[in-house]
Structures are given as structure tokens and as C-alpha cells.
Amino acid sequence: MEQRHLGRTGLRVSRIGLGTLTWGRDTDEHDAADVLKTFWEAGGTLVDTADVYGDGGAEYLLGRLIEGLVPRRDLVISTKAGSVPDPDRRFDGSRGHLLSALDASLTRLGTDYVDVWHIHAFDPGTPLEETLQALDLAVSSGRARYAGVSNFCGWQLAKAATWQLAAPGIRTRLASTQLEYSLLQRGVEREVLPAALDLGIGLLPSSPLGRGVLTAKYRNSTPPDSRGASEHLAPFVAPYLDDTASRIVDAVQTAADGLAVTPLQVALAWVRDRPGVTAPVIGARNAQQLTAALSVEALSLPDEICRALDDVSAPVHRYPDHDWSTL
């Protein structure tokens, strides 16, 4: 699998990442082992997790698998901290919480470092410089090799990255940012992606298949074994089952038919090759799903197909998102 630099750093990662959102919950150890081995054998390196996935079960399961199944040195492990199960405070970006969470992640993963450590979300209740200091301490102590953020909007990302570049002392520049990005969700193109490109921050799109909807499996009904049929994941899929999404899925299906490939391959290739994208993160629940996704490695979409998909899925950009002179 082709490797790409993560932002403006020397770290290289596979251009498709493996997500573990369902590990330890909907994906058991047997399926997770098959998925990880398939990913590794295909040349995949980037494995993304978080301390809240499966209430820590995803990290624990990944740690068990890298003990004997896949060499730790062959993987680029990314995890996240900051989300908390508190209805009154969804995110905790305090230095104390973040560093404690990182230590707990390392214990579950059975490793003394992670390759990339992300702040899971912006915490308005904590000064940003305190949150960023946790990144500096994690890297300077050797517990993390690189650092990034997740779910930061444009101004939050720009402020964080600029602080790390300009503040006095030894600071850790942001290597990456992780947000949802697909043909069904192009909101990052308004401000986040331009900021990331300008600041040399690699984008790791989550849900690049539109929460599974862009595979076209929901066109006629909800498959009983899908996330849309899962009690706790159905609300996650539901926003992308409207008429607007249906038109985009139809266009993806048409493109796939014309290229003799699958809708999954078209949707994944589109986001993988967008400017600024380092590696979309896919959440395959079994090896069969992963193999289907990895088959996109040899596919590059023709320009005319990209333009057609761009047009049908184009987000609404108004002032001041675009230069006023073009409006």
C-alpha cells in the first residue's frame, strides 16, 4: 500500500487507515484479529482508536493482538483522549485528565508509546494553551511520538496550530487533524481543510463512506446486519438516509457502474485523493468488508467522474467562506 507523509512531518503512514470504533463491542476478538492481520498483510500501517471506543475495550483488544499477531514496530498506532462519559461535560481538555487518560491508554495497549496522540475534541472549559501543553508533555516524555487534534473547527485548528508554531519554548507542531469527510459530509472544505493545507496538517477523514451509506447498501432497505439496524448505531446512520444523500448515492452508483467497480471503491477513492487528505480511516467490521475496501488501492477516478461527483455533492459556500470577489 502506498505510504504518505502525515502532514508536514517525517512520519509516513498507509494511505488507508484502519478504524476500531466497533472493537470490543460489535466486533469481537476473532473478527478483529482477522481484520488486523488482513490490513497488515496488505501493507496497512495506520491503526486508529480512542480511549472511549468500547469504553476502553478497543484499545485493550488492539493491545492483545499486537502482542503476538502483528509486530508493534509495523504499526502506526493513533489514539485519542478528551471525551468523557459525563452528560454535563462531554469533553475534558485539562492537562491532568489528558495525561492520565494517555497513561491508561498505554496500559490497555500494552505499549510504552503511541505514534500519534490526538485531542478528541475542543474543550471550551479549559484554556487551549493548557490542553496543548499536554501534547508537549506527552511528546517530550516519549509517551507519544507525534500529536494532533480531532473535531476542531477551522478557527480552533488555526489557533492551536499557530500557538504551537509561535509560542515560546519547545512546542510540538500539530501533525494531523481528524474529522468526518465524505461525499455526504463536505463541511470541512469551508474552513478546516484550507487551514490544514496552509499549516501543513494532514487530514485523517473519519466515516469516509458516509457512515456506510455510500456503499449503497441502504438504497432499498436497511440490512439487518448493518449499523443502521444496530440499536446504538442507528441514530449515527440516520442523518444520511435523506433525499439529498439518496441523490448522491445514486450518482456514486452510476459512476461505479460505468467503471465496473463498486460504490464503496468510488466513494473511498474520491476522498482518499482529495487535496490535503493523508489517509481516510475505515471501520470494517470483518475481513471481508476490509478486503473490499482495500481493493481501492489500484483505483484512481477519472477527472470527469471526480467533477461529476463534486457537482452532485457540492456543499453550499457563501460569504465569507469564499473570496468575496467570486460571489
Which residue ranges define each predicted feature?
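N-terminal small/glycine-rich loop or linker at the start of catalytic domains
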Residues: 7-23, 78-90, 113, 118
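Conserved beta-strand positions
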Residues: 18, 49, 79, 116-119, ...
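Active-site mouth loops of central-metabolism enzymes
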Residues: 20-30, 84-99, 120-126
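N-terminal binding-site loop/beta-alpha segment at the start of enzyme catalytic domains
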Residues: 1-75
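Phosphate/pyrophosphate-binding loops at sites that engage ATP/ADP/AMP, CoA/4′-phosphopantetheine
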Residues: 70, 103-112, 260
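Short, acidic/polar
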Residues: 27-39, 93-109, 157-161
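Active-site groove signature of glycoside hydrolases
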Residues: 106-125
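Beta/alpha (TIM)-barrel catalytic core signal, keyed to glycine-rich beta->alpha loops juxtaposed to Asp/Glu
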Residues: 128-312, 327
